[in-house]
Amino acid sequence: SSTETPPSYNQLNYNENLLRFFNSKPVTAPVELDPPKVESSYVSSARGEDARSTLSPVQGFEGSGGSGSSGNFTTGSNLHMSSVTNTSNAGTGTSGTGNSGDGGGGGGADGTGSGAAPPVTLTESLLNKHNDEMEKFMLKKHRESRGRSGEKNKKSANEAMKMLEYSGPGPGHGHGIKRGGSHSWEGEANKPKQQLTLNPSGGGGGMPLLLDITHTSSSTQNKGLAGVGVGGAGGGVGGGGSGTGLGGNGNVGSGNGNNNQASTNQYTQSGLPCTQNINLWPPFSVGITTPTSVLSSHTAVAQSSFSPQHSLFPTFYYIPASIAASSPSGTNPSPNRPHKHAHVHSSSEKPSTSQAAAATMPLQYMTGVMYPHPSLFYTHPAAAAATAMV
């Protein structure tokens, strides 16, 4: 009796099966042989095995190949005992034939070896001893099977822990796996924005590409845009006016487009480094779109002299209602406003081109409406005038 759970139902029924068999007193024995003689022959065969191999009957029976698992103990023992009674029924009645019958039931190997064992009467002490041996044997097998399963569970748990260690978060996987060419917001949030300052001695003027709208006047922005070639596009406000959504403005600004092309050619001939280290918002690695992929209404803006890095988030310009009346005009505020850079204009530059285009072509901007614009570099003169008047 142990606190461990028994491995099978047959272990619980083993003693019960033995008692049930001996209490049934099978009628197969002949009349001249009394049933105790049959029982003594069975016990003599069992004790003969015990004396020869120091194993209990079912243990020896299992070792000789009768039943390989504990689940077959009861059926094996029943077959074993019925074979003994049948051989006794054959009329031989000796312990030798009983053993041969036992060998037949147990695999045929044990019949000849234990024929010389003396018959032992079946007593209660022998049965108790046999039961104790079988209980120890069963518990030993049960512990072994549990030990094997426990080792397997430990191994599987260790393997799972190793897999977790191998695939766990390493030093580079703290915030998830990043894509190859992307830049996170963390690393570049505090970096200064690099402005591309142009040479003031060039023919296109010294306006930086990243325009500071709040500190520049509308007239200087128009001139700077016409010279830089970012706004050489701006030189054609007719072409730039196509940003308002008017379909025919591309054709209207074609005359100014020639001036734009001349200004951009002049800009490229001056040898100014246009596409230097441009590091602008946002910090995502946005692919540099070629100028041909820009909207057709803004082809005057994106000339071949530079390749803009378009923003993921479009820039919105808001024109208040109070300034909308003066927004198309190219009025010059007081010249005391601070400018970021000195502007040197060449003789071939026409600073009045964008103003004339803005005056000849009325811009249909609605007051109080947000207008998106696809480029970071190009600022519409109407929006520039509105912000300059503030």
Curated annotation (Swiss-Prot):
Main location: nucleus
Subcellular location: Nucleus; Cytoplasm, Perinuclear region
Keyword annotations: Biological rhythms, Cytoplasm, Nucleus, Phosphoprotein, Repeat
Entry's Gene Ontology BP terms: circadian regulation of gene expression; entrainment of circadian clock by photoperiod; negative regulation of transcription by RNA polymerase II
Record PTM text: Phosphorylated with a circadian rhythmicity, probably by the double-time protein (dbt). Phosphorylation could be implicated in the stability of per monomer and in the formation of heterodimer per-tim.
UniProt keyword annotation of Repeat present: yes
Job of this protein: Essential for biological clock functions. Determines the period length of circadian and ultradian rhythms; an increase in PER dosage leads to shortened circadian rhythms and a decrease leads to lengthened circadian rhythms. Essential for the circadian rhythmicity of locomotor activity, eclosion behavior, and for the rhythmic component of the male courtship song that originates in the thoracic nervous system. The biological cycle depends on the rhythmic formation and nuclear localization of the TIM-PER complex. Light induces the degradation of TIM, which promotes elimination of PER.
Protein name listed in UniProt: Period circadian protein
